[in-house]
Every structure is written in C-alpha cells, then in structure tokens.
Amino acid sequence: MTKKIHIKKNAWIGARVNILPGVTIGENAIIGTGSIVTKDIPDNAVAVGNPAMVVKMIEKK
C-alpha cells in the first residue's frame, strides 16, 4: 500500500523536488529546488537539501 503526500495551504515546492510517501509539507512552508524531502516539514519552515533540512523558520508579522 502507498502512503499519501500531504501539502498544506500556501506551501511552495521548488522544481525537481522529490517528496517521499507519507510526508506532510506544512502550511506556508518553502521547499528549495532539488530537495529530497524524507520527513515532515513543519508550518512556516524553509527546508533545503538532500535530505531536506529546516534552515529557517518564517516569522509571521
């Protein structure tokens, strides 16, 4: 059985990003180009790399 990928509201996904099954991309999250997302990314996070790691949290104004 395959697991679904969940992409929440206002998330930005860069070109050539791979997202593994069962992963959730949080609301307002940004995933950098070419990243490989192996685990959940929280709301308001910027994640990049292989594997994708959170490098910054976006502050709400």
Predicted segment positions?
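Left-handed beta-helix
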Residues: 3, 8-9, 14-15, 20-21, ...
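Terminal amphipathic alpha-helical/low-complexity segments used for targeting or macromolecular assembly
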Residues: 52-61
